[in-house]
Amino acid sequence: MEFLWAPLLGLCCSLAAADRHTVFWNSSNPKFRNEDYTIHVQLNDYVDIICPHYEDHSVADAAMEQYILYLVEHEEYQLCQPQSKDQVRWQCNRPSAKHGPEKLSEKFQRFTPFTLGKEFKEGHSYYYISKPIHQHEDRCLRLKVTVSGKITHSPQAHDNPQEKRLAADDPEVRVLHSIGHSAAPRLFPLAWTVLLLPLLLLQTP
């Protein structure tokens, strides 16, 4: 049973270390006034999209903000124009939901167990844009999410790969092989004859 604690502890630590970044996706959010609204996340962090929500009837149904959100490439992000319906990520289309505002979450994980899930990589940026459902204006809400990663250093120019090899791999190094001869002194045939001759003489009649 004690072996089960290790993966469970690792899972709990990873969940505890993950941060959640909240984005209120509506036209009144001042952060969308800038063209470069950017969030920096780490792997396993979450981005929570909070959809527009109206608790009273002071706003006409036709004026309630609703959006289709897309996950697009950089060029489409700059143009604020998706290329395919396959890029649809979510829909904010329940502005008067009784349970409160809809929350749409993206986990920026390296691997996903889901077939249609999205996988993210360190050091890459991902782009979200939206198109309004409630009206036909061209105002673009867009978000850039950058997954921060570790900086990897390339090997130094003075590193010599020969120094990292085992000594036995160097042909100029003399090594003792396992099939080498024994270090015990050898007895030549003449010496064996001298030693055995007295025994042979004792056995003759």
UniProtKB/Swiss-Prot annotation:
It is found in: Cell membrane. It is a lipid-anchor; GPI-anchor. SUPFAM superfamilies: Cupredoxins. A lipid is attached at residue 182 (GPI-anchor amidated serine). InterPro entries: Cupredoxin, Ephrin, Ephrin-A_Ecto, Ephrin_CS, Ephrin_RBD. Induction: By TNF and IL1B/interleukin-1 beta. Undergoes proteolysis by a metalloprotease to give rise to a soluble monomeric form. Residues 183-205 form a propeptide. Brain. Down-regulated in primary glioma tissues compared to the normal tissues. The soluble monomeric form is expressed in the glioblastoma multiforme (GBM) and breast cancer cells (at protein level). Disulfide bonds join 51-92, 80-140. Its main location: membrane. Glycans are attached at residue 26. GO terms for cellular component: extracellular region; plasma membrane; side of membrane. Belongs to the ephrin family. Cell surface GPI-bound ligand for Eph receptors, a family of receptor tyrosine kinases which are crucial for migration, repulsion and adhesion during neuronal, vascular and epithelial development. Binds promiscuously Eph receptors residing on adjacent cells, leading to contact-dependent bidirectional signaling into neighboring cells. Plays an important role in angiogenesis and tumor neovascularization. The recruitment of VAV2, VAV3 and PI3-kinase p85 subunit by phosphorylated EPHA2 is critical for EFNA1-induced RAC1 GTPase activation and vascular endothelial cell migration and assembly. This is Ephrin-A1. It comes from Homo sapiens (Human). The gene is EFNA1.
